[in-house]
Amino acid sequence: INCLGVEVFVENTSISLPQPPGFVSLEGVSSETYGMMQDLTPETNRLLAGFITKNDAKSLLQGGEAKLKEYFLVQTFQKLEDKTFTLSEFGQFRKSIRKDQESAVSLNQEKIDELTKYGSDKLSDRFDADISFGISGVIPLGVSSETAHAIAVSSLSKYEESINGKKSDRLIAGTTVFQLVKGKLLYLYVYKDYVKDA
């Protein structure tokens, strides 16, 4: 299993993404699972990299399935890829994120439903199955960390899944890190599955 980081490009800027401890790059392990992550990426974003646990990687390489109870995704917002942020501009961006969190402002349910419908349709096509999922009960947990180059916000969500009529629920803790690297804005999404059939 390749334990090196991943080099990505945002516009013409090369960025080296270090590999999180205990995780490996998904792209070289399973093109199908990586494609699934691309299907779940909003149309406004671009998936740069995905990282899964070493145990999941071993399972996939041996022909098994990944549990995906913990994983990382790195994305960009496509309309901002050509913009190079100054530290001052990113400071204003952090301020707006902080303000939204302090007032518990998050995606409204209609927008969440729109995003999950898009992902459900893509996954159904990919696996030729009736797949749907929804996100409800989002609880913002506020800003979990902040530096001059990054701000992280966390939340708890209930994921409801249905595959060919078989339903299950999961409680997911998620953290989104908005990271400034070489003037480019990266979105790092970290997910951990805590409870199944919550």
Regions inferred by a protein language model and the residue ranges of each:
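Extracellular structured ligand-interaction cores
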Residues: N12-S14, P20, K69-L73, A173-G174, ...
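A mature extracytoplasmic/lumenal domain signature
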Residues: Q19-P21, V29-S30, Q78, S154-S157, ...
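Start-of-domain marker
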Residues: G5-T44
